[in-house]
């Protein structure tokens, strides 16, 4: 179950190469992650609970597949940075930031709705995706 969740979350960014446009690639990844939060909020919450419990079922995956995936994506971003095509940031920390900010919409749905004074979750996701596309 968790492998499927993680594969879906990261699929869009898995095929990104140094030849891709960094802004487009990152925006596409963010939009996809926000959409996953909208479509599969329970998956995000289950993953968060697994991590908060010390990752008893995911430890091996995190140490192997996930670590390798993050390092591969970070290497692509580092090349973009080295080429002057992306602002100098720590690529691994950027991945963590994208994961956390996009999954926030699923994990803290009640908070987002109350703060935004919205009755429907989907309104917020649609607005967020539109804003990301403009960046």
Outline where the language-model segments fall.
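Alpha-helical structural segments
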Residues: 1-16, 24, 28-35, 60, ...
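Active-site micro-motifs of SAM-dependent methyltransferase domains
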Residues: 8, 53, 100, 104
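Helix-loop segments that flank and shape redox-cofactor active sites
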Residues: 18-20, 53-54
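Amphipathic alpha-helical segments that line or abut small-molecule/effector binding pockets
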Residues: 23-52, 92-99, 130-134
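All-alpha amphipathic helical-bundle segments outside canonical DNA-binding/catalytic cores
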Residues: 24, 60-65, 82-97
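C-terminal peripheral helix-coil segments that are non-catalytic and often amphipathic
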Residues: 35, 39, 67, 71-85, ...
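Amphipathic alpha-helical segments used for helix-helix packing
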Residues: 38-60, 108-115
């Amino acid at each position: 179950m968790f492998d499927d969740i993680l594969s879906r979350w990261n699929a869009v960014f898995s095929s990104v190469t140094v030849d891709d446009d960094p802004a487009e690639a990152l925006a596409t990844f963010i939009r996809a992650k926000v959409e996953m939060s909208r479509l599969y909020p329970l998956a995000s919450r289950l993953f968060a609970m697994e991590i908060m419990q010390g990752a008893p079922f995911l430890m091996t995956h995190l140490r192997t597949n996930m670590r390798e995936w993050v390092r591969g994506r970070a290497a692509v971003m580092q090349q973009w940075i080295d080429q002057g095509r992306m602002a100098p940031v720590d690529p691994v920390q950027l991945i963590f930031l994208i994961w956390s900010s996009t999954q926030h919409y699923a994990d803290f749905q009640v908070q987002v709705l109350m703060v935004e004074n919205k009755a429907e979750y989907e309104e917020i996701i649609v607005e967020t995706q539109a804003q990301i596309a403009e960046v």
